[in-house]
From Swiss-Prot:
GO terms for cellular component: mitochondrial inner membrane; respiratory chain complex I. Belongs to the complex I subunit 1 family. It catalyses: a ubiquinone + NADH + 5 H(+)(in) = a ubiquinol + NAD(+) + 4 H(+)(out). It is an enzyme of class 7 (translocase). HAMAP family: NDH1_NuoH. It comes from Strongylocentrotus purpuratus. This is NADH-ubiquinone oxidoreductase chain 1. PANTHER family: NADH DEHYDROGENASE SUBUNIT 1, NADH-UBIQUINONE OXIDOREDUCTASE CHAIN 1. It is found in: Mitochondrion inner membrane. The gene is ND1. Core subunit of the mitochondrial membrane respiratory chain NADH dehydrogenase (Complex I) that is believed to belong to the minimal assembly required for catalysis. Complex I functions in the transfer of electrons from NADH to the respiratory chain. The immediate electron acceptor for the enzyme is believed to be ubiquinone.
Length: 322
């Protein structure tokens, strides 16, 4: 019976994530349609609400193709690893579901998120295609480059809040959000999350005019869907992660409603901002993408970290201990 309840808890935790991924695709197409003065999907179901399910059925009934000279085990294992890491990261988020509230949850999120580059690189190499390999190398270089700025910003927030625990960091913002006191870091964090999740205008891994579809160009059917679900689950995760770190704090409506209305509203605004950026800005060149993080964001992140260390030393705030 214990195993049955554990399985039910896991299902109740995963189904909302998968449904949110499905409807995020619909919202994205609707937003892009309205910003381009056209209607989005509006045929399948009322207001097009059944369009994600129709797309899912169409993709899953497609044949799973495998290149002749590919590495079969790594070729099919990479999408599974990518999706598993994306869903595993949700276990450390402070949501109203059975999650892991660990003392070093922030470090675990940072470490596990960096492991996704192995799945991307494995898929590009196992496909035995030059376009897949070039897309994978681009994605890995981009992810690693922007993770440095993200890690420095996280270190600044850890020092500022004196804790590695996500729940504690969220609760320390009860009277003032970190986005107000650390506004430049908040801006750098938002742009870096776009690059980290390979979203426009930093979607260089999917440059259609250069490398076709990037590291997943040889995937079709089920394995492609696993990559797709993992990418959009990471987008939702990074948006919620941003809300917890910079716009956290208990809502005054928590006693009236079962969920925090303020956090849900801000998270929805964040998601709309990500979609709006895709519709408004063209794709960067790859050299501009690299120069942005190494010549702009990295020096600013290091300077902000030094400033916060000096402020902590002046105010006598205790540094976090393991």
């Amino acid at each position: 019976m214990v195993y049955v309840f554990s399985i039910l808890e896991l299902i109740s935790f995963l189904i909302p994530i998968l449904l949110s991924v499905a409807f995020l695709t619909l919202v994205e197409r609707k937003v892009l349609g309205y910003m381009q003065f056209r209607n989005g999907p509006n045929v399948v179901g009322p207001f097009g609400l059944l369009q994600p399910f129709a797309d899912g059925m169409k993709v899953f009934i497609k044949e799973e193709l495998k290149p002749v000279n590919s590495s079969p085990y790594l070729f099919f294992f990479s999408p599974l690893l990518f999706l598993a890491l994306a869903l595993l990261l949700w276990n450390f988020m402070p949501v109203h579901t059975p999650t892991l509230d660990l003392q070093l949850s922030l470090l675990l999120v940072l470490g596990l998120s960096s492991l996704s580059v192995y799945a991307i690189l494995g898929s590009g190499w196992a496909s035995n295609s030059k376009y897949s390999l070039l897309g994978a190398i681009r994605a890995v270089a981009q992810t690693i480059s922007y993770e440095i700025s993200l890690a420095l910003i996280l270190l600044s927030l850890i020092i500022f809040s004196s804790s590695f625990n996500l729940t504690y960091i969220m609760n320390t913002q009860e009277f003032s959000w970190f986005s107000l006191s650390c506004l430049p870091l908040f801006y750098i964090w938002f742009v870096s999350t776009l690059a980290e999740t390979n979203r426009a205008p930093f979607d260089l891994t999917e440059g259609e005019s250069e490398i076709v579809s990037g590291y997943n160009v040889e995937y079709a059917g089920g394995p492609f869907v696993l990559f797709f679900i993992a990418e959009y689950a990471n987008i939702i995760l990074m948006n919620y992660f941003s809300v917890v770190l910079f716009l956290g704090g208990p809502s005054p409506l928590n006693n009236l409603f079962p969920i925090s209305i303020i956090i849900v509203g801000i998270k929805t605004t964040f998601l709309f901002s990500v979609l709006w950026v895709r519709a408004a800005y063209p794709r960067f060149r790859y050299d501009q993408l690299m120069f942005l993080t190494w010549k702009s964001y990295l020096p600013l992140s290091i300077g902000a970290l030094c400033a916060i260390l000096a402020l902590v030393a002046l105010l006598g705030i205790s540094l976090p201990l393991f």
